Swiss-Prot record:
GO molecular function list: NADH dehydrogenase (ubiquinone) activity; NADH:ubiquinone reductase (non-electrogenic) activity; quinone binding
InterPro entries assigned to the protein according to its UniProt record, in alphabetical order: NAD(P)H_OxRDtase_bac/plastid, NADH_UbQ/plastoQ_OxRdtase_su3, NDAH_ubi_oxred_su3_sf
Full protein name: NADH-quinone oxidoreductase subunit A
Subunit organization: NDH-1 is composed of 14 different subunits. Subunits NuoA, H, J, K, L, M, N constitute the membrane sector of the complex.
Catalytic activity: a quinone + NADH + 5 H(+)(in) = a quinol + NAD(+) + 4 H(+)(out)
Species, as recorded: Chloroflexus aurantiacus (strain ATCC 29366 / DSM 635 / J-10-fl)
Entry keyword set: Cell membrane, Membrane, NAD, Quinone, Translocase, Transmembrane, Transmembrane helix, Transport, Ubiquinone
Transmembrane segments: 8-28, 64-84, 87-107
Source taxonomy: Bacteria, Bacillati, Chloroflexota, Chloroflexia, Chloroflexales
EC class name: translocase
Function: NDH-1 shuttles electrons from NADH, via FMN and iron-sulfur (Fe-S) centers, to quinones in the respiratory chain. The immediate electron acceptor for the enzyme in this species is believed to be ubiquinone. Couples the redox reaction to proton translocation (for every two electrons transferred, four hydrogen ions are translocated across the cytoplasmic membrane), and thus conserves the redox energy in a proton gradient.
Amino acid sequence: MLANYALIGIFLVAAISFPLIPLVLAFFLRPKRPTPLKTSTYECGLEAIGDVHVQFKVQYYLYALAFVIFDIEVIFLYPWAVAFNAVGLYGLIAATIFLLMLFAGLLYEWRKGALEWV
């Protein structure tokens, strides 16, 4: 019984140390002084034109956030679709309520103008 816990412990130590060791090594082996070339934006090997820091509209992030939210909701609907015959009326009611809440969120985003591109 103790051997099983030892294997789990060894696995956890290996799983934690596997990504941490390269990060620590990179931290100590990297060059300490950044050069102006390293802080500039890379544009296909050409000299940077204009300011290096580009501002993005918040609208792009709102679209990305809405996509992630609705994508995750579709993942939550997959088990219900697989077990559709087994869940019965209670599962149908629960999924309908879930979809109505999703639709309400979509309407809210639409009315607030989060889906307007311009």
